[in-house]
């Protein structure tokens, strides 16, 4: 009995050591504390990381997020995985996407946000509590920011802005704009949502996200909207330069 108990104890100690080692490896790679591996995708190799405790990172701790409620995470993960499996491993690698950090109530400089991309660490932080109405689209919106930041030369914002009517002007920054609504316009006039009108990169990300979720509806709208049609063609051409096999 003694030997049996000792073997069990050694196994438990080993598992604890392995878990701690994994946590240290994750921190060394992406510099976010209190994470654990939630799942490694067999489809495209994404490492999904769960937050065991609240964390604070960035300049002066300006990025904060809370630990995940496990029941909430279990429910949201079904949606998250379904959407991210639309991207193959080769495409993700080309766009510096490897780690998805899952947490609740994500803030940057006291502003709530759905996601924070970091191509240097190949990491995307996702707020699993983001508004359910827009949640799936937000996932692709944030993926686009990873894509654009990885290939800025293919997403010329001056060229993009030239598609708009001459009198239109974007805001100076997304956070200094009151153009925040995410609902799809009935009459697009070059923009799918009010948020699209904030800055060029958000405009691109909004179109990309809608194409990933509801391509047919957006293409139908573009048939009556030349500006939107040009923007869609621009995104498709840019993506083809990154990965010719990519399809919406």
Predicted regions and their residues:
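Auxiliary, metal-adjacent structural segments of Zn-dependent hydrolase domains
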Residues: 57-120
